[in-house]
Amino acid sequence: MNKIIVFETTRLFLRQYKDEDFSALHSIFSEEETMRYYPAPFSMSKTYDWIERNQSRYKSDGFGLWAVCLKETGQLIGDYGLVKQTIDGRIEVEVGYHTNKRFWSKGFATEAALACKASKYCRP
């Protein structure tokens, strides 16, 4: 899969997940504090499934969670985007994001949210 940039901000670019993102994503998803609102941190298997599920969503839904990368270095620092959830028997679209703990409190999630809001990719 090629590096497909979905949209950019001053400091970030958001792109589709690649299989090579596993290590960076697993370091985020296996961190207990980051995953405190999930039943448990992700195993390696769950992280692989997460990548595959979002790659499928790009094709089926036209959106999903995208890799959030620093423009300056290309480093993946988290993900951000839209996902479908079933709530009370209805399919709803929600905003989701995860950020590597080292990058908390730097405004990256807000920056990604504002760019997403202005993007055609955040209009399901």
PLM-predicted stretches and their roles:
Residues M1-R102, A115-S119, R123:
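GNAT-family acyltransferases
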Residues S105-T110:
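Glycine-rich acyl-CoA binding loop
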